[in-house]
C-alpha cells in the first residue's frame, strides 16, 4: 500500500491516527536510536546522559542580530560561549580531557540569517585534526564558499533549519530572506559534499501548521543525509512564551509526511519539542510514524518500543548522528 503525503495531510485527526495504528505507513526500522545529547541532563531507568560527552557551544556567545520571537537569544544562554577561535580551541581541548567525543557548534545569526562561521574554520580544522572530535555545525543561511570551507575543515555534518513559509520567516524570524534562500543553502551544502541534516520546525508560526509540508518539498529536491523534525516549544521570557505549542498529532503529521516522502532517508524526532504530558503522545506517535531515532525519549516511549519488540540503542550524541547510525544498523 502506498501513501501520499498530501493525501493524508488533509485527512481528519481520527483517520490519520487510524492509519498510524495500522502500522502500514512504512516498514518498522531495524533499530530505534535514542539520543540524550549533553546540553541537557537526561535520565531514565534505561539510560542517563553525561553532560560533557557532546556539548553545544555558541560561536557568538549570547549575541544574535535577529531576536526571533520564539527564541530572543534565550537558547544561546544554554550553550557554552566560545565567541573567538582561540576560546573555541581552548574549550575544545579542555572538553576532550573531560571525555568529550563530539561538539555541536551553534550561535546567533547575522542580519542575513547566517551564522558567522568563516572566521572559525581554521580553529575547526585544528580541532578535527588534533583532537579527532566529531563536529556538527548549525549553519543558518549559508553560501557555497563557506560550505566548502567547512567541508575542507573536516566538519562531519551541517545542520540547517528549513522554513517553508515566507510569512513565517518574516513575522517570526525577523528575517528579510525568502524560502528561496533556504533552497539555495541546501544547494550549497549538497554541492560542497558535506553531510547535511535539514530540520523542519513544526508550529513555528504561532504554534500552528504553516509551511511544514512546503519545507519538506524544498528538501525533496536534494539528497539530505538525514532529516530531523522538531517542534515549537514556548520559552519563558520570550514574546511567544504563552503561545500554545502544536499538538502531538500535528507533529506526527509532519513526521509521517517526512517518512512517506523520504522512505530511505534516516529520520529522527529531535530534541526541541513540547514538554509535559503531550511529550509521551508525541514520542509514541513518532514511533508509529517509523522514525529511526528520538532525542530525549520519554520513559513511556521507551517502554512502548520495548513492548513492540523494537531493538534500540542509547547514545549521548546529537540526534543528527542518525545520518550514520541508521545506515550502519541496516
Question: What residue ranges belong to the model's regions?
Answer:
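Conserved Radical SAM active-site core
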Residues: 46-55, 73-172, 176-196, 204-214, ...
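Radical SAM enzyme core and accessory elements
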Residues: 1-22, 279-284, 288-330
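Conserved, mostly hydrophobic/aromatic
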Residues: 68, 105, 258, 286
Amino acid at each position: 500500500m502506498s501513501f501520499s503525503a498530501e493525501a493524508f495531510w488533509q485527512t481528519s485527526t481520527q483517520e490519520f491516527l487510524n492509519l498510524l495504528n495500522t502500522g502500514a505507513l512504512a516498514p518498522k526500522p531495524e533499530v530505534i536510536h535514542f539520543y540524550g545529547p549533553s546540553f541537557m541532563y537526561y535520565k531514565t531507568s534505561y539510560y542517563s546522559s553525561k553532560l560533557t560527552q557532546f556539548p553545544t557551544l555558541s560561536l557568538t556567545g549570547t549575541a544574535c542580530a535577529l531576536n526571533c520571537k520564539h527564541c530572543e537569544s534565550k537558547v544561546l544562554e544554554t550553550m557554552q560561549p566560545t565567541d573567538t577561535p582561540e576560546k573555541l580551541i581552548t574549550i575544545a581541548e579542555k572538553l576532550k580531557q573531560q571525555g568529550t567525543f563530539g561538539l555541536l557548534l551553534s550561535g546567533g545569526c547575522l542580519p542575513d540569517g547566517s551564522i558567522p562561521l568563516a572566521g572559525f574554520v581554521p580553529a575547526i580544522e585544528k580541532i578535527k585534526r588534533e583532537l579527532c572530535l566529531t563536529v556538527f555545525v548549525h549553519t543558518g543561511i549559508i553560501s557555497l564558499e563557506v560550505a566548502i570551507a567547512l567541508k575542507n575543515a573536516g566538519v562531519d555534518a551541517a545542520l540547517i533549519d528549513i522554513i517553508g513559509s515566507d510569512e513565517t520567516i518574516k513575522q517570526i524570524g525577523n528575517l528579510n530572506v525568502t524560502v528561496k534562500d533556504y533552497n539555495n543553502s541546501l544547494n550549497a551544502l549538497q554541492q560542497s559534499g558535506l553531510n547535511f541534516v535539514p530540520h523542519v520546525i513544526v508550529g513555528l508560526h504561532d504554534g500552528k501548521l504553516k509551511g511544514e509540508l512546503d519545507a519538506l518539498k524544498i528538501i525533496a529536491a536534494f539528497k539530505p543525509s538525514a532529516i530531523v523534525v522538531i517542534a515549537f516549544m514556548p520559552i519563558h521570557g520570550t514574546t511567544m512564551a504563552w503561545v500554545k505549542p502544536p499538538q502531538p498529532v500535528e507533529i506526527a503529521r509532519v513526521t509521517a509526511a517526512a517518512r512517506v516522502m523520504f522512505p530511505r532517508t534516516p529520520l529522527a524526532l529531535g530534541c526541541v519539542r513540547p514538554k509535559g504530558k503531550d511529550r509521551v503522545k508525541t514520542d509514541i506517535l513518532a514511533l508509529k510514524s517509523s522514525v529511526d531515532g528520538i532525542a530525549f525519549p520519554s520513559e513511556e516511549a521507551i517502554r512502548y518500543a520495548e513492548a513492540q519488540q523494537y531493538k534500540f540503542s542509547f547514545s549521548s550524541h546529537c540526534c543528527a548522528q542518525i545520518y550514520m547510525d541508521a545506515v550502519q544498523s541496516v
